[in-house]
């Protein structure tokens, strides 16, 4: 969705890792966040990166070291990149009763939540950072059928899950790209929660 919005901008580009995206007018190239050799393919001219890659390592201390190494490399070798819009997750919030918002202080109670929060903290240390914390993402290319196809774990629960349509998420990111002085953290959910198997 964002690719079509920015395809006409010569300074816009995208990356892919395992599976090339559908053909688009947007310039794209392969990128492996885990390999320093791959970092050099990142262009030098943009000011903002939209980062959608999830944490790579399951061990929080090791992921912290890896992220710091990447950020240090970026500050030294890609000095024009000043801002990152990071797609995190509402999974950073504890799964217990309580009221949580963007400025709450909390400790995630899942490893994936801890890894996401570590990523947010480290990126904020090196860049001007906008964090978008979406709920479960649904819409074209995001259904349960695809998760089953790729062997992803599906939690079956009757508890409603906060979610957001992929087009609405893209709209939020587009707004942040065009408005660099917007808020630094957004919980991105709609008003139509569903059980986990419908997300």
Predicted feature locations:
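N-terminal Rossmann NAD(P)H-binding glycine-rich loop of SDR-like oxidoreductase domains
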Residues: 1-9
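N-terminal Rossmann-fold cofactor-binding loop
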Residues: 10-20, 32-33
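Conserved Rossmann-fold cofactor-binding substructure of NAD(P)-dependent oxidoreductases
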Residues: 25-47
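NAD(P)-cofactor binding segment of oxidoreductase domains
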Residues: 42-85, 118
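Conserved Rossmann-fold NAD(P)-dependent oxidoreductase catalytic core, especially the SDR/UDP-sugar
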Residues: 71-109
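Conserved beta-loop-beta element that borders a ligand/cofactor-binding pocket
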Residues: 120-140
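Substrate-positioning beta->alpha
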Residues: 137, 143-146, 155-177, 184
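Mid/C-terminal beta-alpha module of Rossmann-like enzyme folds, strongest
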Residues: 172-175, 179-199
């Amino acid at each position: 969705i964002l690719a079509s919005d920015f395809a006409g901008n010569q300074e816009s580009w995208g990356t892919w890792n395992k599976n090339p995206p559908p053909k688009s007018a947007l310039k794209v190239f392969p990128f492996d966040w885990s390999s320093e050799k791959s970092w050099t393919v990142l262009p030098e001219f943009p000011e903002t990166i939209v980062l959608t890659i999830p944490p790579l390592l399951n061990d929080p201390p090791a992921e912290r070291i890896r992220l710091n190494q990447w950020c240090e490399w970026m500050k030294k070798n890609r000095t024009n990149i000043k801002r990152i819009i990071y797609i995190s997750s509402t999974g950073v919030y504890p799964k217990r009763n309580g009221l949580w918002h963007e400025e709450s202080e909390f400790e995630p109670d899942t490893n994936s939540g801890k890894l996401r929060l570590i990523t947010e903290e480290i990126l904020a240390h090196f860049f001007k950072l906008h964090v978008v914390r979406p709920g479960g993402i649904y819409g074209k290319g995001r259904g349960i059928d695809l998760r089953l196809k790729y062997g992803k774990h599906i939690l079956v629960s009757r508890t409603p899950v906060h979610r957001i349509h992929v087009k609405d998420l893209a709209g939020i990111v587009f707004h942040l790209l065009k408005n660099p002085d917007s808020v630094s953290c957004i919980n991105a959910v709609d008003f139509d929660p569903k059980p986990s198997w419908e997300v």
